[in-house]
């Protein structure tokens, strides 16, 4: 069986052992690059609603369009994971940004279903390259919980702005205004690419473990199957994210909630989720990453089951706030867990691929359920089941780590 060498603790690593990716400028560049990689995925509810209103697509067709974006995210992430260890990351990021710019422009030029699906696929590929380069670069830091908390904190702020500004843009320019927003968002990011380190200094998959006292070396062998199982869990959890996030706006409309109420709830839900990044960092230092992750997944299952029973103003608000908070919370720990195992970014670069694959499949699955008149409760039950699978996998991984690498199992 293959093995990976990993660390027992990285937090007190000495300055001379810091990588280029620990530098504030590098973290800043990677985080800003994440804007272009996650904008469509995080703004998906309002984008889907805008395409429905502006272009008149059915729910099944909207599922295909959402899946096109997410399939592109998968393809871009896989491409990046294959080349990120050896290719200049500035070049990768530039290619991704140019694809985002061109594809969003072409999305405004043809409103027919198939050409628009191709444009959204291309935009997704560009976003996948950007996001994978972002996560692989942040994984090079020796304080994963901190760097990914910073990333998600900033992305939540950006997403709150998106939920505020998108209804205004849609009312004036329709869905083409949203495509142009993503285009103009990507252009200035090209200017900060020189701040991004070109390569990962670590050429191998082995990671030297530095003890808390920073005085001895400890190499712990972890079965290769464990990080791979973590990627499967990411995929399973993002089936929830893809289905819920693509159709929660439509579920609110079906429950006769006003568009103002829906967009306002989405906006405040994102603002509230900022506390998730801060709490995640505090809990990681106090309890490690695994236990809070298991708790958060359990709460997410309960949230989906409540929404499956009834969608009204109360359950809609509860689900948005719970989902927004724990989604960010869970992402911090998922990314942090893989980064504790592998600083080279190989597995972290695969996270967007797993997210993209799940989010490519999930809207289509949800759309099929809805096309059979099974209602939004069937979508929420599907989300709960997918999250339960992720919970089981992470529980198994945690138990195995307690046996082979207890310091990593409860690492922050």
Q: Where are the predicted features?
A:
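Extracytoplasmic gate region of multi-pass secondary transporters
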Residues: 45, 226-267, 271
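Conserved MFS/SLC helix-loop-helix module at the cytosolic interface between two early adjacent transmembrane helices
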Residues: 75-112
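Helix-to-loop junctions at the C-terminal end of transmembrane segments
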Residues: 76-89, 276-289, 370-371
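Cytoplasmic helix-loop-helix junction between adjacent transmembrane helices
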Residues: 119-153
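Intracellular juxtamembrane helix-capping segments at the cytosolic ends
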Residues: 129-142, 328-342
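Helix-loop-helix hairpin linking two adjacent transmembrane segments in secondary transporters
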Residues: 141, 150-201
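C-terminal transmembrane helical hairpin of 12-TM major facilitator-type secondary transporters
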Residues: 287-334
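A late C-terminal transmembrane helix in Major Facilitator Superfamily
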Residues: 341-375, 383
């Amino acid at each position: 069986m293959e093995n990976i060498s990993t660390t027992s603790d990285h937090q007190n690593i000495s300055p001379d052992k810091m990588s280029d990716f620990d530098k504030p400028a590098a973290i800043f560049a990677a985080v800003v690059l994440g804007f272009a990689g996650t904008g469509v995925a995080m703004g998906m509810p309002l984008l889907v609603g805008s395409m429905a209103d502006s272009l008149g697509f059915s729910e099944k067709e909207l599922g295909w369009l959402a899946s096109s974006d997410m399939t592109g995210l998968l393809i871009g992430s896989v491409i990046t994971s294959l080349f990120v260890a050896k290719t200049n990351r500035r070049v990768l990021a530039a290619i991704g940004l140019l694809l985002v710019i061109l594809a969003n422009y072409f999305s405004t030029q043809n409103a027919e279903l198939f050409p628009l699906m191709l444009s959204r696929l291309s935009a997704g590929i560009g976003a996948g390259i950007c996001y994978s380069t972002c996560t692989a670069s942040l994984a090079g830091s020796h304080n994963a919980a901190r760097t990914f908390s910073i990333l998600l904190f900033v992305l939540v702020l950006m997403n709150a702005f998106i939920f505020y500004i998108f209804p205004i843009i849609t009312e004036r320019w329709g869905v083409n205004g949203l495509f142009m927003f993503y285009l103009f968002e990507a252009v200035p990011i090209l200017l900060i690419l020189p701040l991004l380190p070109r390569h990962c200094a670590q050429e191998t998959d082995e990671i030297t473990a530095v003890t808390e006292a920073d005085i001895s070396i400890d190499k712990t062998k972890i079965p290769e199957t464990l990080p791979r199982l973590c990627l499967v869990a990411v995929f399973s959890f993002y089936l929830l994210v893809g289905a819920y996030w693509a159709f929660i706006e439509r579920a609110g409309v079906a429950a006769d909630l006003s568009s103002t109420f829906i967009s306002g709830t989405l906006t405040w839900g994102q603002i509230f989720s900022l506390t998730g990044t801060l709490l995640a960092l505090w809990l990681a230092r106090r309890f490690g990453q695994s236990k809070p992750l298991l708790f958060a997944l359990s709460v997410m299952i309960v949230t989906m089951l409540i929404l499956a029973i009834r969608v009204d103003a109360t359950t809609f608000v509860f689900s948005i706030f719970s989902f927004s908070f724990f989604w960010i919370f869970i992402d911090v720990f998922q990314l942090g867990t893989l980064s504790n195992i592998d600083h080279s970014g190989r597995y972290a670069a695969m996270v967007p691929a797993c997210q993209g694959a799940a989010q490519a499949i999930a809207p289509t699955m949800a759309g099929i359920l809805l096309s059979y008149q099974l209602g939004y409760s069937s979508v929420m039950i599907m989300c709960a089941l997918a999250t339960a699978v992720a919970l089981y996998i992470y529980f198994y991984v945690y138990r195995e780590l307690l046996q082979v690498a207890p310091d990593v199992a409860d690492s922050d």
